[in-house]
Each structure stands twice: as structure tokens, then as C-alpha cells.
């Protein structure tokens, strides 16, 4: 994985299909221009995953809407940008919604959410909904939480808070996701595993090693830090109350 940034990006070709002509394969390609430059910001971002810690924990009961005004300071000098994942659109309007499941992308467009909000998705969804879905630049083909984190890095943010980024716990009959049991998600009693997610996040930490990644943790989560992340000097964990203070929520 190579670090890439919005300031060097004009757009890219995506493959819509492959046809055979005269015995040879040819790709049908479309140029997708870059339409969301987003390089003018405070370099602070909040990436919100769908782990249960963001709705079910002891301590401060923080509403997602608080993140939309966090770190404002004088005239919004330190206000961060918010990135959300998949079905979170039903509960909150982040600055940027990232969707990696084509079925969910269809649902989001049909709901009307994409009419007035920025939604990033994969090439398939962009080709199907060109007026409503924006292409994830140089899509790393990762899970949604990791893709949203990558996008925040791509946009040039240098401090990224990760909220609702929970491990799948050791209970084999528990899905640690807010939307477990709903369409396009695993069953409530089906542990999805987290090794791919852990590996994807580690790749991002290593690639964007000039970014300060901060995972917000609740009671009991501190000990659940993946072993692979412990060696990342640009990654740390922060208790919820300390996060509220540091991020000026």
C-alpha cells in the first residue's frame, strides 16, 4: 500500500466490463473525474464505525451529533470532519458517508439520502448511480471502517479519531455490530471475526505513519487492543471522557 493524497488526484478510469473482439479481450473503461476535492480543512477527522461501544457502554452517553460540532474553537477553527460507515446514515448525517456493500449503496440511493449528502462508494455502485455515489479514490478494497479511515488519510487529515472501532470479542455467538441482524449484515449470534479488519487497519497505520490515529475506548476495551497495533508508534487509545476533553466535545 502506498500513501496517496487528494492534492495529487484528478480522477481515474474504472472498468465497466470486458468484451471479446477478434479473439482478444478488451476492457470497457470510463473516466471518473474527481468531484470532491476536500483539501481545505483543519486536518482533524472523526471516523465512526458501527461497533457496539458507540451506543452501549458505561460512562459518558455521547450522541453522534456532538461530533459534528466537536473541536470548533473560535469561529470553528478546530472543527473536524466526520466520516461514517454504511447504515449509519439512518442515525446520523456525517460529512462523508462511505458504503462498500453494493446492496447498501442501492438502499441509500433509494432512501433519498444521497440527494443532499456526499456518499463515497465502489466502482460498481458509481457506475449504477453516477449522480449519487462518488468513487472512493484508488479504492483499497478494504472493509468499510478501514476504507473510511483510508479516505480520511487520503484527504490529508493528520489526527484521526476512531470511534466505534470495536474488536469482535471472543464470544463465538455474538456479532459486535450495531446493525447485526439487519439486511446485508451478519446475524446477531454470528461472530464475524476481525482478523482482516485488524490487518487492514495495520496497513493504514503503517502507510500513513505521519498521522496520529486515536481509538476511543470504553471500559474493558483497553485490553482488547490487537497485538499487531501495539507496535504502531502513531496509534494510541483514549478513554471516552478523555476523548471528550481532548476533542473539545
Which residues does each PLM region occupy?
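Metal-ion/cofactor- or nucleotide/acyl-coenzyme-handling active-site neighborhoods
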Residues: 1-249
Amino acid at each position: 500500500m502506498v500513501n496517496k493524497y487528494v492534492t495529487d488526484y484528478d480522477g481515474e478510469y474504472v472498468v465497466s466490463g470486458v468484451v471479446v473482439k477478434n479473439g482478444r479481450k478488451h476492457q470497457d473503461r470510463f473516466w471518473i473525474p474527481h468531484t470532491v476535492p476536500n483539501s481545505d480543512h483543519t486536518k482533524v477527522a472523526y471516523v465512526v464505525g458501527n461497533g457496539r461501544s458507540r451506543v452501549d457502554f458505561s460512562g459518558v452517553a455521547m450522541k453522534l451529533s456532538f461530533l459534528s460540532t466537536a473541536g470548533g474553537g473560535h469561529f470553528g477553527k478546530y472543527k473536524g470532519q466526520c466520516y461514517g460507515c454504511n447504515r449509519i446514515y439512518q442515525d446520523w448525517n456525517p460529512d462523508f458517508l462511505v458504503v462498500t456493500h453494493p446492496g447498501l449503496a442501492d438502499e441509500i440511493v433509494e432512501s433519498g439520502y444521497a440527494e443532499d449528502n456526499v456518499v463515497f462508494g465502489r466502482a460498481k455502485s458509481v457506475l449504477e448511480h453516477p449522480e449519487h455515489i462518488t468513487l472512493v479514490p484508488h479504492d483499497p478494497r478494504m472493509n468499510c471502517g478501514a476504507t473510511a479511515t483510508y479516505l480520511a488519510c487520503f484527504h490529508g487529515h493528520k489526527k484521526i479519531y476512531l470511534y466505534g472501532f470495536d474488536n469482535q470479542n471472543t464470544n463465538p455467538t455474538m456479532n459486535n455490530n450495531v446493525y447485526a441482524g439487519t439486511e446485508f449484515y451478519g446475524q446477531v449470534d454470528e461472530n464475524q471475526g476481525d482478523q482482516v479488519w485488524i490487518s487492514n487497519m495495520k496497513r493504514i497505520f503503517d502507510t500513513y505513519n505521519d498521522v496520529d490515529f486515536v481509538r476511543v475506548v470504553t471500559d474493558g476495551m483497553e485490553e482488547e487492543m490487537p497485538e499487531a497495533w501495539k507496535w504502531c508508534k502513531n496509534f494510541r487509545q483514549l478513554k471516552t471522557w478523555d476523548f471528550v476533553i481532548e476533542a473539545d466535545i
